[in-house]
Structures are given as C-alpha cells and as structure tokens.
C-alpha cells in the first residue's frame, strides 16, 4: 500500500505547513481515528517526489498508510502531503495520550489558561485532576501528568497535595506514566539538599541552588541555546549544528545537574529584554498579551546582573528518567508563545510542548 508523508520542515520561524497548531490538530485527529501514525525524525533525500520531480530533501515529518479516510482528514485540515510507494522505516510510532492536567491549588490560572489554549488548538485531549483526585490515586488511569506554572517554587503544590499527594505522584511516574512540568512544574520533581524544603519530590538528580527563593531572578525574555539539536522536542526547531530559542522567562528554576538520571537539553545564554531600562523591548509584541504582562506588568524585572548571577549557563530545559518513565522539565514558558515575531496562535515555541507530548507518547 502507498505511503503518505507529511513534511514538517523548519522554514525560518515557521514550518513548511500552513499552520503549526493546525497540523498537529490534524495529526491528533488521525490518531484519534485509530490511524497508525509514525514520526520520521531523520532527514530524507528523495530522488523525486510528486511536488519536486527533480528530487528534494525533507528534514522530518510524519508517515501513514494512504487511505480515503486519512485523505479526508488531511484535506479538511489543508495539510500538504506527499505520496510514495515506499519509505524508510520511520523512527517512532505515535499513540494518543491520556493526559492528566493538574489544576489543584498549585496551578496558577495565569499560567494554566494559556497552556489549555495551546493544547486545545492542537486537539490534544486532557482531563483536569484536582488535589483530591491525585491524593485518591486517580492518576493511575492516565499516561502522563502535566503540571503548569505556579506562583512560587513548590510550596503551593504541597499546600494542596500534602505528603500523600506527593507519594502518589512519585508512584505514578515510577510505575504508570510520564511527566511534563513548566516553570513551577519544573521545580516540583527537583531534589533539595536543605532540611527546610519538603516541597520538592526529590526524584531527579538536579537542583536549584537558590532552593525556594522563587523571586531571586524576575521576568524577561531570554535566549536559550540548544544543547542536543537531535532531541525530538527540538524537531522543526533546531537546524544545523547550532540553534537557539527565544522564550518568556518568569521566575523558573535555574537547574543544576547533579547526577546521571537527568541531562540538560538547553541552557540559558542571553537576556534579550525585560521591563527595566535600557532593556525594554522596542518592538511590537503584537497579540501576545502574556509576553506584554511579563515585561510591563510584573514588578520583578530580570536585570543583566541577575541574569549573569542566577541564570547564565544554567540548565533551562532538562530530561530525566525515574524508574521506567521520563520527565521533561521546562524552566521558561513555551506556552506563552513568541516574542512578537508573529501571531501568538502560530508560535513556534509551542513545538516544545507538542513535540514533547509526541515524544512521551512514543516511549
């Protein structure tokens, strides 16, 4: 049977498809219809294609068998697709994820609301779980736990979950599913070496030396240098031997790797802008209201001195293993979108979330 190939090459700050979120919406629609969908992570040079008879190189994409039902979904989503008689064996088979979205006391609405929008516009399904749900062991019915940002470095999670909830999360990651945490959610699995901090899970060999001093840095726009350009979360983001991403930072952890079960995928490199002169952005942030809030409406502005002292060279994005499952930890906020390079809804930064979820689904 013929194969369909959905290219997803990086083209500047966008991709070769018309819409980043729209393409993932179609991919999830295919998965939800039971279509076998594979992620082709390695680049392929074709001698000829229907669109490029002289031959063409594609960086990455998605593979499925040709069918009328699949074509209907692809056509309805206006997704560009190539047809081939045969293709190299793809890297991973993708599966629908049953996501537990934490919305207990530790989930700050200003951080969880944009993450909900990012998931919805790409057709990722999820269910909210409360502190009570977690404490009662209901995480066992899910494939992964997604923890959004919080207003502090972890104590708010403990205020709702307590020891029982923390033990349920540890057991879930060890025995049942994966974990993705953003900002405060990236603090939660860290290990503290201070007796007065019972608010982290202590399940990965990474820490923040400032411990619970959530307000030690501030908010601003940062450039993160990608350490592992071949990691799947950077698919359609990293290209060539050196790549970076520009993201909103809002008091996230400066992670320091302390052991072998965690590795840095990207590190803080440059402070681009903040709400303090002379670093106030001189460009239009368009419809990205969260980026505006991080710069104009937050009292604690990230300064060059604080960036150098607290963040420069520290781990910004990490991957960890805990027993049989994986954790992805994002200190900056990919769900807050771009820094004024285009419409918020088409932010390339969302790929850290979309790719991350697909990566976890394939494990």
Each model region followed by its residue ranges:
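Catalytic beta-strand/loop cores that center a nucleophilic Ser/Cys/Thr
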Residues: 222-326, 331, 335
């Amino acid at each position: 049977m013929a194969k369909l190939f959905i290219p997803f090459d990086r083209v500047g700050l966008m991709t070769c498809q018309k819409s980043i979120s729209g393409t993932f919406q179609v991919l999830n629609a295919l998965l939800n219809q039971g279509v076998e969908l594979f992620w082709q992570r390695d680049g392929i040079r074709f001698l000829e294609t229907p669109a490029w008879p002289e031959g063409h190189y594609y960086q990455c994409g998605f593979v499925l068998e040709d069918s009328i039902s699949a074509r209907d979904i692809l056509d309805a989503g206006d997704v560009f697709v190539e047809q081939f008689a045969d293709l190299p064996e793809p890297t991973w088979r993708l599966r629908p994820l049953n996501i537990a979205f934490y919305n207990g006391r530790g989930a700050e609405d200003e951080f969880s609301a944009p993450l909900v929008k990012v998931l919805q516009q790409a057709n990722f399904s999820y269910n909210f779980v409360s502190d009570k749900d977690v404490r009662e062991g209901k995480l066992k019915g899910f494939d992964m736990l997604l923890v959004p940002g919080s207003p502090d470095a972890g104590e708010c999670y403990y205020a709702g979950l307590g020891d029982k909830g923390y033990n349920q999360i540890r057991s879930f990651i060890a025995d049942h599913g994966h974990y993705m945490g953003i900002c405060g959610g990236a603090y939660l699995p860290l290990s503290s070496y201070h007796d007065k901090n019972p608010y982290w899970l202590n399940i990965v060999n990474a820490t923040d030396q400032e411990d619970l001093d959530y307000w030690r840095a501030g908010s601003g726009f940062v450039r993160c240098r990608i350490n592992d350009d071949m990691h799947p979360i950077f698919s359609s983001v990293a290209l060539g031997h050196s790549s970076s991403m520009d993201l909103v930072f809002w008091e996230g952890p400066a992670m320091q790797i302390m052991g072998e079960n965690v590795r840095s995928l990207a590190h803080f490199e440059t402070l681009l802008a903040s709400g303090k002169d002379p670093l106030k952005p001189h460009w239009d942030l368009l419809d990205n209201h969260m980026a505006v809030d991080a710069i104009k409406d937050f009292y604690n502005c990230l300064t060059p001195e604080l960036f150098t002292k607290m963040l420069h060279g520290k781990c910004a994005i990490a991957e960890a293993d805990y027993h049989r499952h994986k954790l992805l930890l994002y200190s900056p906020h990919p769900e807050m979108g771009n820094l004024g390079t285009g419409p918020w809804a088409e932010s390339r930064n969302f790929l850290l979330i979309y790719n991350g979820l697909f990566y976890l689904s394939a494990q």
